[in-house]
Curated annotation (Swiss-Prot):
GO terms for biological process: mRNA splicing, via spliceosome; spliceosomal complex assembly. It is found in: Nucleus; Nucleus speckle. Keywords: Acetylation, mRNA processing, mRNA splicing, Nucleus, Phosphoprotein, Repeat, Spliceosome. Belongs to the crooked-neck family. Identified in the spliceosome C complex. Present in a spliceosome complex assembled in vitro containing CRNKL1, HPRP8BP and SNRPB2. Component of the minor spliceosome, which splices U12-type introns. Isoform 2 seems to be predominant in the spliceosome complex. Interacts with PPIL2 (via the PPIase cyclophilin-type domain); they may form a trimeric complex with HSP90. Residues 81-106, 827-848 are annotated as: Disordered. It comes from the Eukaryota. PANTHER family: CROOKED NECK-LIKE PROTEIN 1, PRE-MRNA SPLICING FACTOR. Involved in pre-mRNA splicing process. As a component of the minor spliceosome, involved in the splicing of U12-type introns in pre-mRNAs. This is Crooked neck-like protein 1. HAT repeats lie at residues 222-254, 256-288, 290-322, 324-355, 357-388, 390-425, 427-461, 471-503, 505-539, 549-585, 587-618, 620-652, 654-688, 690-721, 726-767, 769-807, 809-834. The gene is CRNKL1. The modification Phosphoserine is found at S503.
Length: 848
């Protein structure tokens, strides 16, 4: 009985090179061990990533105790039990020797006796753990088990032993080990690593087929037949893949089979006649093989079928020109131009004519070109073409036609810049200025940047100072135009624009800008929106009066502005006053009075009354002044200034009683804006009239209304300044009365102010006893703390402040007495401490 293990086929590389060493997974595959007589036994193969080796074993009865294979460094070791060492194993002639590897396969025949020993055969390991290559293990045995072999010491075994051992082997099939550590490996495999290793080994690259040498015509025909069959099969699989057709035709062309290649191209055109590459390859084949007429026919068919493909036209005209057929090329160009192609096609036609010195034909083409593509750049190219060939008059006409063609609606600065540069080259500087100014007057500023730049450069080169200033003014004018167009209610921009125009332009141009500016009336009738706008009218009127010297137009401007202002909601006293002053300068006093009277009637304002009264005072019309003051006080009885001015007017006129009556009316008003000023003016008036009793009565009446410290001081100083007998006594009495009155006053600073004024009086006019008396009334300054609270009532800390404690108030407050006693006790304690320190000092002195 012999057991043979043979035909083990694997890939060349070892499995360990393709499997991640960190993978903890265990994959098992079971294969059948096929015997030569049809018997099968399971062959178990297992890949262990832990050892990076393939382990496999046979489930035969003789191997069930050690079914697995031990790991070796180079591959897998096949264990077969034997009674002797591996050196006692004999291999059959057709089998490979142990440890031998031959072209990716190993065939081993192992014969062993019944006694246990190990036969180790290193086998190559497949690259993939799933074994892309199959293998067969054949066992030759009549009794389906190992038999004894003479000279080997292997004992025979019976079939029953084999069956028992087989059953035991089937029960002991290795199980998949459970993975206990499921944590990820420290080093992870990446796709980059897999791709790099695959590229290094180049497993997917197949070796090139061997070169075939053709030695006779029969082999050549056979080769052609096979290639044509291959091409036809490819075409039959997918007819729409044009590359297959082109390869087929090029292969036929390489064999000089032009007719066949032409037939293939025609078949391909039937499939997809819109394919540009197909037409190009077809025509190129004909041209390479010098089939000119065929090429012409193909190009004709191509441009007829696909007239918008410029590449066909370019190659067709180029072929005709290379063949020297200039007329034919021109005819092709003409056919092309009928389709009105893109600009480059026209330029190609023009350059073609210029290569043959056909300037007139090129000019004709340009005439057609600028009509088909009417762009500014094309007109400029046409003009430069004429200039290049020294047709300057024609070039000027082209520019003029272009300016007329585009008109004012589609003006482009590049056209005028090119036109001006052309005239500059011709030394026509006046023409250049006219062109620039014409363009600047009609093109918006944002579209004329290049125009301004070139105009400035031109003036710097050929102009004078005035010309440069004109450019700057023009540039600023366009800037302001853009600003006011963007925002018509931007009155600051209008002011700047008008200032610029007034300094340079004529009167009509200035008036036009003013009319445009004042036409932008504020949309909201609120005075804050009209404040800047009304100055446009004022500047307009002043310009007409001072610059244009047109009084009648100035009057019209004033009247128009006054009619525009909504006087029921608000008015502008400045406008009325300026109008009245203008009429006075024109010696129209009646119109001035009428204007001021109208303003007072429509919207009485203090400023209007004051100006009108001042005017009448200058004219010495006092009756009119009285009437105006009366009217003024009817509209504003709370205005103390008006009352004072009215009384002063009567005082100047010598009507004292009338002035006193005006003051009495004034102080009797229930509401006044500045009553203290009015009372002071009334008192000063009585003092000037030397009415002491009236003045004293006024002070008493004023003190009934207010107990302000300044009133008391002023009253005392009045009594002192009267100069009569007993004035000092009356003054002192007033101070004493004021002091008594202000004891209950919360404002201690005012009371202190009164005492300081009283002390100054006593120092100047009083005796020593009077001074001492006032000094005793002076308060003591004390620093205190108080809690500070915010607006929401929360505490904000403490603050220090100075308070004044008056002796008169301290006598009535027991807590102040307690504070005084505490200060006295503290003083006594300090004196006592000082006395205790003096004896020590005496002892020190005696010792020294």
């Amino acid at each position: 009985m012999t057991a043979t293990v043979e035909n083990l086929t694997f890939q060349k590389d070892t499995l360990g090179n393709a499997v991640d060493k960190n993978t903890s997974r265990l994959e098992l595959r079971s294969y059948s061990l096929a015997g030569r007589h049809g018997s099968t036994e399971p062959l178990v193969l297992a890949w262990s990533s832990q050892f990076r080796r393939l382990t496999w074993g046979c489930a035969l009865d003789a191997l069930h105790r050690s079914p697995c294979v031990a790991a070796s460094q180079h591959g897998v070791t096949h264990l077969i039990r034997s009674s002797r060492t591996p050196h006692s194993t004999r291999c059959r002639k057709e089998d490979a020797q142990p440890g031998h590897h031959g072209n990716g396969a190993a065939s081993v025949t192992a014969q062993a006796r019944g006694q246990r020993s190990v036969l180790q055969v290193p086998l190559p390991v497949p690259r993939s753990c799933l074994f892309s290559e199959s293998f067969v293990v054949s066992v030759s045995s009549q009794s389906r088990f190992l038999a004894s072999v003479p000279g080997t010491g292997v004992q025979r075994s019976t079939a029953a032993d084999m069956a028992a051992s087989t059953a035991a082997g089937k029960q002991r099939i290795p199980k998949v080990a459970k993975v206990k550590n499921k944590a990820p490996a420290e080093v992870q495999i990446t796709a980059e690593q897999l791709l790099r290793e695959a590229k290094e080994r180049e497993l997917e690259l197949l070796p090139p087929p061997p070169q075939q040498k053709i030695t006779d015509e029969e082999e050549l025909n056979d080769y052609k037949l096979r290639k044509r069959k291959t091409f036809e099969d490819n075409i039959r699989k997918n007819r729409t893949v044009i590359s297959n057709w082109i390869k087929y035709a090029q292969w036929e062309e390489s064999l000089k089979e032009i007719q066949r290649a032409r037939s293939i191209y025609e078949r391909a055109l039937d499939v997809d006649y819109r394919n540009i590459t197909l037409w190009l390859k077809y025509a190129e084949m004909e041209m390479k093989n010098r089939q000119v007429n065929h090429a012409r026919n193909i190009w004709d068919r191509a441009i007829t079928t696909l007239p918008r493909v410029n590449q066909f036209w370019y190659k067709y005209t180029y072929m005709e020109e290379m063949l020297g057929n200039v007329a034919g090329a021109r005819q092709v160009f003409e056919r092309w131009m009928e389709w009105q192609p893109e600009e480059q096609a026209w330029h190609s036609y023009i350059n073609f004519e210029l290569r043959y010195k056909e300037v007139d034909r090129a000019r004709t083409i340009y005439e057609r070109f600028v009509l088909v593509h009417p762009d500014v750049k094309n007109w400029i190219k046409y003009a430069r073409f004429e200039e290049k060939h020294a047709y300057f008059a024609h070039a000027r006409k082209v520019y003029e036609r272009a300016v007329e063609f585009f008109g004012d609606e589609h003006m482009d600065e590049h056209l005028y810049v090119a036109f001006a540069k052309f005239e500059e080259n011709q030394k026509e500087f006046e023409r250049v200025r006219v062109i620039y100014k014409y363009a600047l007057d009609r093109i918006s500023k944002q579209d004329a940047q290049e125009l301004f730049k070139n105009y400035t450069i031109f003036e710097k080169k050929f102009g004078d100072r005035r010309g440069i200033e004109d450019i700057i003014v023009s540039k600023r004018r366009f800037q302001y135009e853009e600003e006011v167009k963007a925002n018509p209610h931007n009155y600051d921009a209008w002011f700047d624009y008008l200032r610029l125009v007034e300094s340079d332009a004529e009167a009509e141009a200035v008036r036009e800008v003013y009319e445009r500016a004042i036409a932008n009336v504020p949309p909201i009738q609120e005075k804050r929106h009209w404040k800047r706008y009304i100055y446009l009218w004022i500047n307009y009127a002043l310009y007409e009066e001072l610059e244009a010297k047109d009084p009648e137009r100035t009057r019209q401007v004033y009247q128009a502005s006054l009619e525009l202002i909504p006087h029921k909601k608000f008015t502008f006293a400045k406008m009325w006053i300026l109008y009245a002053q203008f009429e006075i300068r024109q010696k129209n006093l009646s119109l001035a009075r009428r204007a001021l009277g109208t303003s007072i009637g429509k919207c009485p304002k203090n400023k209007l009354f004051k100006v009108y009264i001042e005017l009448e005072l200058q004219l010495r019309e006092f009756d009119r002044c009285r009437k105006l003051y009366e009217k003024f006080l009817e509209f504003g009885p709370e205005n103390c200034t008006s009352w004072i001015k009215f009384a002063e007017l009567e005082t100047i006129l010598g009507d004292i009683d009338r002035a006193r009556a005006i003051y009495e009316l004034a102080i009797s008003q229930p509401r006044l804006d500045m009553p203290e000023v009015l009372w002071k003016s009334y008192i000063d008036f009585e003092i000037e009239q030397e009415e002491t009793e009236r003045t004293r009565n006024l002070y008493r009446r004023l003190l009934q209304r207010t107990q302000h410290v300044k009133v008391w001081i002023s009253f005392a100083q009045f009594e002192l300044s009267s100069g009569k007998e007993g004035s000092l006594t009356k003054c002192r009495q007033i101070y004493e009365e004021a002091n008594k009155t202000m004891r209950n006053c919360e404002e201690k600073e005012e009371r202190l102010m009164l005492l300081e004024s009283w002390r100054s009086f006593e120092e100047e006019f009083g005796t020593a006893s009077d001074k001492e008396r006032v000094d005793k009334l002076m308060p003591e300054k004390v620093k205190k703390r108080r809690k500070v609270q915010t607006d929401d009532g929360s505490d904000a800390g403490w603050e220090e402040y100075f308070d004044y404690i008056f002796p008169e108030d301290a006598a009535n407050q027991p807590n102040l007495k307690l504070l005084a006693m505490a200060k006295l006790w503290k003083k006594q304690q300090q004196e006592k401490e000082d006395a205790e320190h003096h004896p020590d000092e005496d002892v020190d002195e005696s010792e020294s």
